[in-house]
Amino acid sequence: MSSGNLGQIFAQRASELREYIFSQPASNFENNPWALAGAIETFSNTKGHMMIFRDAKLAIAKEQLMAQQPAPRTILEFGTFVGKSALAWGAILRDIYGERVPEDVNVYTFDPNPQMVALARDLVKLAGIEDIVHVLEGPGSDILKRLYAEGKVASVDMAFFDHWEEFYLPDLQLIEELKLWRVGSLAIADNTDFPGAPEYLAYVKAGGNGTAGSVKYESKSYETQAGRGPVSAFLIPLLLLFVSC
């Protein structure tokens, strides 16, 4: 399937999701990002399959973030799509800190597609977490450089890679170059099996570039069952990296 056809399918699914969510009473989702993330999962299961970060994977990521010490303050997401995972990151941070989340606790999520950005912003606003989750339009590498230059991102506690797999490694290495990782930082990469990110996998499984004083990675893979029934069920690896500087 060509990228153009894939883009059309994504656009159609996003439009259908918007209609599905906003046809329901706003009170179902106001100030409740978990309910909204759950509704997106339900839509994908029942109305039209979408390439979202599924609940089974999210549960693993949530467990890691909830246990992280010190508690996470800055999360980067490369690839917003419709915003399901961004909603979840914001919800997790609110679960950690309570209703009064400190101003320096933020999720920055990046996507070059204006339709996806608009939808994600509307969903984040509906869920009442727009003070935590910032949906930014453009290539993640460019935006991260700007945020770093502006002093808005000084360290990264977790980075989530769920965009085009060919950019996983360059964007991981950009975080290294900007010296944003700390000991105990977490990186999560989705879809490392299919379509696949072989260069990224080789790099992180080798522990990094191997030079003295560089970031070193410890990787752990998980397999989760896709929730689409026994016929189409399959295992999906989720790669977590634990940074030791």
Predicted regions and their residues:
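Active-site segment flanking the S-adenosylmethionine/decSAM binding pocket
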Residues: T80, I132-P195
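Active-site flanking loop/helix segments enriched in acidic
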Residues: I40-H49
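Alpha-helix termini
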Residues: N28, A67-P72, L93-E103, Y148-V153, ...
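General small-molecule cofactor/ligand-binding pocket signal
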Residues: G7, A11, Y108, H134-L136, ...
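Short, well-ordered secondary-structure micro-motifs
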Residues: A88, L119-D122, K145-Y148, D171-L172, ...
